[in-house]
Amino acid sequence: MVAGCSDTVSVNAPPLTGADARACRALLRALPDSVADQARRPVADEDGFAAAWGDPPIVLRCGVPRPAGLDRFATCQVVNGVGWFIPESQSQGDPVDITMTTVGRAQNVQVSLPSDYFPPANAMVDLAPALERTIREIRPCV
């Protein structure tokens, strides 16, 4: 998914069209310059639906498929109005690499957070305003 090449981060983001592409472009324009106290980095992504911060990179991909394990029994966390799913194996309290995905939004947004930036709450707080403004909530996280 991610490979560093000098200052540019290579990301495989999904190809999107229509409303999904418009919402994800709006999100990328609204994203902050820093996440978890890490500066934004340039991204090599053909379709333009990804962003990155820091080294090792925190990587955001917009318009991803629903993650495996996210079902009606999965737990989610709400931080500043945005619901997040983190696989149970990654949410035991130990610093591990985390892949967290928004819950209940019209487009799924996935953030890969290296263990260097554990716990994930700082990144969730930093990303919440842009997500709230641009990616429509269709179902609350419960």
Labelled PLM ranges:
Residues 5-9:
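Bacterial signal peptide processing site
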Residues 10-13, 17, 48, 97, ...:
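Residues at structural and domain junctions
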Residues 12-64:
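N-terminal secretory signal peptides
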Residues 14-15, 32, 65, 87, ...:
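Proline-rich intrinsically disordered, low-complexity coils
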Residues 29, 36, 67, 116, ...:
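Residue-level marker of positions within ordered structural domains that often coincide
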Residues 64-70:
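Short, charged/polar surface micro-motifs in flexible loops or helix N-caps
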Residues 71-142:
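Extracytosolic low-complexity repeat regions of secreted or lipid-anchored proteins
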